[in-house]
Amino acid sequence: MEGRKFLKSQWEKLSDIKSDQQKGVNPPERFLGYDENNVICLSDFSTLPTRTVLETIKKRTTKRKFKEGKIPQDKLSYLLWATQGLREDKGKYTFRTVPSAGARHSFETYLYVKGVEGLKEGIYRYIPEKHGLIFLKEKDDVLLSKALLNQTFNSQVIFFWSCIPYRMEWRYSIVSHKMIAIDIGHVCQNLYIAAESVDLGVCAIGAYSQENADKLLGLDGNDEFVVYAAHVGKA
């Protein structure tokens, strides 16, 4: 019963609490740092044929078995744009392809690449402001299996979403964490719909090892940690 409290609204309590924003604290950085010289530009996806929204929603299912072969890079490019793509940069905040409470966008996207055209195998981070990738390190299949509690399947790429809670906490204090949970649902659903529209399959993973998932991506587990994952492969 205690866990159910997380699902309930606490907005009335905010009137008694001053957020860091209200205290005049500077906002956290909107993006993580990176070396611009190491950004891998992603393929253009503007001519990629897709199904209609109606057809896509009718066909949407969770896939756990995938065909062999590599995913074309333009399809991966499309999925990244559909899930965290930057539509407009307003300076203090950004508008993206997914909604986020107060446009706070507290997530980072990491990829465990096993079979994508034009990309070597390994772990990457998505750079939305450049629509590109940064290579982080070589893959580790043993640690991946531990991180996903042996739900490795045979997908070509695995999306990992991390959360930087303070991006949301800075404005919304105690209600931030429910907002974060709602927001990540928007992100993953966009992945399902976008993938289905280009003949790819998705299996979202909510059951994972927190310690090993954070270790796999090199996250500290406090200021940034994994909140969700999803397999993507050829359907």
Predicted regions and their residues:
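N-terminal amphipathic, basic helical "cap/leader" segment at the start of enzyme domains
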Residues: 1-155
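Small-aliphatic-rich amphipathic alpha-helix that forms the alpha element of a beta-alpha
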Residues: 79, 109, 157-168, 172-213
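Beta-rich nucleic-acid/ligand-interaction surfaces
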Residues: 96-102, 209-216
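Short, surface-exposed helix-loop/turn micro-motifs enriched in polar/charged residues
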Residues: 101, 202-205, 222
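Solvent-exposed coil/turn segments that connect beta secondary-structure elements
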Residues: 114-116, 164, 235
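Conserved hydrophobic/aromatic beta-strand scaffold that supports enzyme active sites
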Residues: 125, 158-160, 229-231
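Short, mixed-charge aromatic SLiMs
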Residues: 130-132, 214-221
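A glycine-rich helix N-cap at a beta->alpha junction
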Residues: 218-235
